[in-house]
């Protein structure tokens, strides 16, 4: 039985999390909180969720021993949790399946979502198509340009994609616009947030749906190797793939946990050069919860940078903020250059194209493997596949199609 039982009933991970939202949104948030409390332990809901994960998403995903990479590094043994093999190509669908099933039970007919890299938008459009729900996706204009393939995928699936032209025109602004929509259309609309941010119950609910990653990993590692892994590594933007892997291991003190943020051009080059609030940010409130943020001395959000569209969110899930402060997890940062190098290494050595987000975790896993002995075992969460990033990488490397 796990001794870790956060958040509390108000959504707090000690000083982080909570519900910081406008009065106009409290009705919708309260309705969602009550519905999730009602259905999360309901046998029929759990059965349908698990069946969909198995037969529609394709779970369980493999835990793959990257023997070629391990041999090349001559260090620790590296295992990859292959979330890239899910339907739609990333971990995002674990969460959208759960929230869409909840929306149906709440009688909602319209789904809205925000997206950065486009993977959450695609995963939301996918489940909306399957369940016959109207779907609107808000996506920053900058992200629309750098993720054109995913925009087309969403439209093919029947979603309406609305480019957001306010602010930095990226993920933060997409969330703002989605929340405005939700306030205006509370009666028929369900907002599927794509990561472990937002007002309670979102950080808990998204974690719960993503925790299948760690639960599977624990069983798979015990079967393949025995015992527990030495180290877990996952990339952190909002942090849903990471908390999905970490959650099952939080009570296992022998397992070291590393979350990898985006150092962009380098942490030393200042706050606009990276997206690493846990490594170089401060505590504040954004999108309904208290957490670490990229903000200036006046409390204004700083627009950071990452090569990866899924890692340039200026905040992070409140549970990660708690895990950092408590010392249970360590948070580090990897530069664009290091992530790109790791992308090429994994592609050439194992024949697996990781997403640029996941490449940050791969890069740090490679660093650790070189430092640790051959008897150590590292699990890296390969949160998504890299098909969506081919154009970005080609552009950076001066390749034209």
Swiss-Prot record:
One Pfam family assigned to this protein is PALP
Pathway it works in: Amino-acid biosynthesis; L-tryptophan biosynthesis; L-tryptophan from chorismate: step 5/5
Q: Does the keyword Chaperone apply?
A: no
Residues bearing N6-(pyridoxal phosphate)lysine are 92
What's the top EC group for this one? lyase
Q: What is its cofactor?
A: pyridoxal 5'-phosphate
Q: Please provide one cellular component term from the Gene Ontology annotations of this protein.
A: cytoplasm
UniProt KW keywords: Amino-acid biosynthesis, Aromatic amino acid biosynthesis, Lyase, Pyridoxal phosphate, Tryptophan biosynthesis
Q: Which InterPro entries match?
A: Trp_synth_b_CS (IPR006653), Trp_synth_beta (IPR006654), Trp_synth_beta/beta-like (IPR023026), TrpB-like_PALP (IPR001926), TrpB-like_PALP_sf (IPR036052)
- Isomerase as UniProt keyword: no
Q: Which SUPFAM superfamilies does the UniProt record give?
A: Tryptophan synthase beta subunit-like PLP-dependent enzymes
Q: Which reaction does it catalyse?
A: (1S,2R)-1-C-(indol-3-yl)glycerol 3-phosphate + L-serine = D-glyceraldehyde 3-phosphate + L-tryptophan + H2O
Q: What does this protein do?
A: The beta subunit is responsible for the synthesis of L-tryptophan from indole and L-serine.
Write out the similarity annotation: Belongs to the TrpB family.
Quaternary assembly: Tetramer of two alpha and two beta chains.
Q: What is this protein called?
A: Tryptophan synthase beta chain
The encoding gene is trpB
């Amino acid at each position: 039985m796990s001794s870790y039982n956060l958040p509390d009933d108000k959504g707090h991970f000690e000083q982080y999390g909570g519900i910081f939202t406008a009065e106009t949104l409290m009705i919708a948030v309260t309705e969602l909180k009550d519905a999730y409390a009602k259905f999360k332990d309901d046998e029929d809901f759990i059965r349908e969720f698990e069946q969909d994960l198995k037969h529609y998403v394709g779970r369980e995903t493999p835990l793959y021993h990257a023997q070629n990479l391990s041999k090349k590094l001559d260090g620790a043994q590296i295992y990859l949790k292959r979330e890239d093999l899910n339907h739609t190509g990333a971990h995002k669908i674990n969460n959208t399946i759960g929230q869409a099933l909840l929306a149906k039970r709440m009688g909602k007919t319209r789904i809205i979502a925000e997206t950065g890299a486009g993977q959450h938008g695609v995963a939301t459009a996918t489940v909306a198509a399957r369940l016959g729900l109207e779907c609107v996706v808000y996506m920053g204009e900058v992200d629309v340009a750098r993720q054109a393939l995913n925009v087309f995928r969403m439209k093919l699936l029947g979603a309406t994609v609305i480019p957001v032209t306010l602010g930095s025109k990226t993920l933060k602004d997409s969330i703002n616009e989605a929340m405005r929509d939700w306030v205006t259309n509370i009666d028929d609309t369900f907002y599927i947030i794509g990561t472990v941010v937002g007002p309670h119950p979102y950080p808990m609910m998204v974690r719960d749906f993503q925790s299948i990653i760690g639960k599977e990993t624990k069983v798979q590692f015990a079967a393949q190797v025995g015992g527990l892994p030495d180290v877990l590594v996952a990339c952190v933007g909002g942090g849903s793939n990471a908390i999905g892997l970490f959650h099952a291991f939080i009570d296992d003190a022998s397992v070291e946990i590393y979350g990898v943020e985006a150092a962009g051009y380098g942490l030393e080059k200042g706050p606009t050069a990276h997206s690493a609030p846990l490594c170089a940010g401060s505590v504040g409130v954004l999108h309904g919860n208290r957490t670490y943020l990229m903000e200036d001395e006046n409390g204004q959000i700083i627009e950071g940078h990452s090569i990866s569209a899924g890692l340039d969110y200026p905040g992070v899930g409140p549970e990660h903020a708690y895990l950092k402060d408590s010392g249970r997890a360590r948070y580090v940062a990897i530069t664009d250059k290091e992530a790109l190098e790791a992308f090429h290494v994994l592609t050439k050595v194992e024949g697996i194209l990781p997403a640029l987000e996941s490449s940050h975790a791969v890069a740090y896993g490679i660093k650790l493997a070189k430092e640790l002995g051959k008897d150590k075992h590292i699990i890296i969460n390969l949160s998504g596949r890299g098909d969506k990033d081919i154009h970005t990488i080609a552009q950076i490397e001066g390749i034209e199609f």
